[in-house]
């Protein structure tokens, strides 16, 4: 009975908090708890009924799941290693691109150490260390699952076509002055919304291109984005540059200042890549913006590394 109440409580709490504000990782944590207790409820209900067929089926399913766990973990580690090698090949040998490879090798090392501790039963210290590491990995795995749920659910935004401003978040430039494909996808996503809003409502939104100038860049990201929008046929009178920000939180804060200076009551929307959408939403909330986001598609091979980096940025 308690399990049912906990499942219902966490599910109801998730619905209420999501309705208030979807831009919180705590929503994902609560949903994970709701799913966990829901599964426990199903298992408990099955065994409590005493139906031999149902109990046999459920017992078989649970046994198979337990037996598959090691293969599942090794499979994830292998996929991360393969993805890490692909990232290094396509994106260059940078530490940030090595994250999937490092984590994949770390998981395999943990598995080997775990089996080593089982075989070497005479070393209690090794056993304690392994248990501690496994508990730590379990904790962060729970948080990562909650983050993935939050990120996935936040993709389903259906903004109204009444926006006054479209904020496009910057990223690094190619050759110091050119818009890379990643940034172009953000701009194209904003243009698509701009065109659709104008077609439906006859209302033109103003673009705010937000991004400062990096050490290896000859112009600001905002200036490069402005040039890209003009090339795509956007009237320069509907483009505002915010060229001082150096991170996502500043993107939001400085863009808000630009919008506040123009009007006091407005609707705004930000555009970024789908993997970055949830964290950008968190920073929008911290900056005092009611803005929700729209996400541009990202190459599939890039997603594992990008999501790991987003998770680290949120939790650290």
Identify the meaning behind each predicted range.
Residues 155-307:
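A structural signal for short, hydrophobic/glycine-enriched beta-strand patches
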